[in-house]
Curated annotation (Swiss-Prot):
InterPro entries: ATP-cone_dom, NrdR-like_N, RNR_NrdR-like. The gene is nrdR. PANTHER family: TRANSCRIPTIONAL REPRESSOR NRDR. The keyword Metal-binding applies. Residues 49-139 form the ATP-cone domain. Keywords: ATP-binding, DNA-binding, Metal-binding, Nucleotide-binding, Repressor, Transcription, Transcription regulation, Zinc, Zinc-finger. This is Transcriptional repressor NrdR. Binds 1 zinc ion. One of its GO terms (biological process) is negative regulation of DNA-templated transcription. One of its GO terms (molecular function) is zinc ion binding. A zinc finger (unnamed) spans 3-34. Its cofactor is Zn(2+).
Length: 153
């Protein structure tokens, strides 16, 4: 690893620690020439996953799009940013662990709704109304009736 201070090509690892729930390795290094220490991070390079949109276009997976949709659905609701990030992390992990190269936006939307439903039903209905493109009040009522039926069972 090249030293950021003097540019020397060689360094030794002084300390290694897992971070970010084991997804990243933090290494303290020492330059063999100038003896200055610096930190590097190592993480697994993820293969790009393509999202198949409704019109069959393909876009690279972007976790920020999911997070932004969840933030809008949870606006003025008692859902913390930590909970929202956890939902996105879980979905991202499920997608990458599936070892698929492509996933439909429909599948991602269903995953988001499933997780939102467990945390906050109002946020779930808000997300569903945009995602499923509710046309009128009857569509809202149908979705609410489904929720009530699930709650009773």
């Amino acid at each position: 690893m090249r030293c950021p201070f003097c540019g020397y090509e060689d360094s030794k690892v002084v300390d290694t620690r897992p971070t970010n729930e084991g997804k990243t390795i933090k290494r303290r290094r020492e330059c063999l020439k100038c003896q200055k220490r610096f930190t590097t991070y190592e993480k697994i390079e993820k293969q790009p996953i393509l999202v198949i949109k409704k019109d069959n276009r393909r876009e690279e997976f972007d976790r920020n799009k999911i997070l932004n949709g969840i933030i809008k659905a949870c606006q003025k609701r008692p859902v913390s940013i930590e909970q929202m990030n956890k939902i996105v992390d879980e979905i991202e992990n499920e997608i990458y662990n599936s070892m698929r190269e492509e996933i439909s936006s429909r599948e991602i939307g269903e995953m988001v709704m499933e997780k939102l439903k467990k945390i906050d039903e109002i946020s779930y209905v808000r997300f569903a109304s945009v995602y499923r493109q509710f046309k009128d009040i009857n569509t809202f009522i149908e979705e609410l009736q489904k929720l009530l039926t699930e709650k009773i069972e």
